Amino acid sequence: MNRLLIVASTSYAGMGPYVSGIVNTFLPNDDVYYFFHDYDDLFFRKNVKEELHSRSTFYKLANSIWNKLYDLIFGHWVYEKDILDLCHEKRIELIHFINGCGSCSFNRKLESMGIKVLGTVHDLYPHEVKKAPHKMLRHRVSVRRLQAAIWECHNLLTNSKSQYVELQKLFPDKNLFYHEFPSLVSKDVK
């Protein structure tokens, strides 16, 4: 198995339980490292099992209007250099963007360093949303960037059988993977 870095860029809208549910299946001796974008609630720090913390980077970034504006204008994460440094330090061979695909420019940079990139397709066709105009603008820009990254990324994974079939039609030359959706039913829900 390649030395793997799993990057989780958000814990919102069910993504936190999705990511922590997957990550918590790994063992500390697995050749896997983790980079979590944590917000003020520290979701990942609280929900990723303690024994994986030594292999984890928890990057706390406030969910502020300024950080959202930065992302909207520049189209990349402020912590990309931190991820690159981690890849170099840990000799990462494969990076899995578990919440999406990373930006096109960042993926190209990683691939130029010999690091394979695996993106996750959650919504091939994004849901319609009704929000305030400034939030709609941010949503549309984010969706366009994500769709561009999906088209450019050579390796894609999805948890949806129907999306997997659609991806096979759209991208017959890409490496496509299907993995069953992990259960979000926790012991608290039971």
Residue ranges of model-derived segments:
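Donor nucleotide-sugar binding/catalytic pocket of nucleotide-sugar-dependent glycosyltransferases
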Residues: W151-K190
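Extreme N-terminal starter segment of soluble prokaryotic enzymes
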Residues: M1-L5
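An aromatic- and histidine-rich active-site surface loop
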Residues: H76-K81, I95-I115, V121, Y125-P126
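N-terminal strand-loop element at the rim of the active site
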Residues: A8-A13, N24-F74, Q163
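A short, histidine- and acid-enriched strand-loop-helix "catalytic/donor-clamping" loop
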Residues: C101-C104, G119-M136, H154-N155, V185
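Membrane-proximal helix-turn-helix segments that form the acceptor-binding/catalytic region
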Residues: K81-D85, S105, K109-S112, Y125, ...
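A short, glycine/small-residue-rich beta-strand->loop->alpha-helix junction that serves as a flexible
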Residues: I6-G21, F97-G100
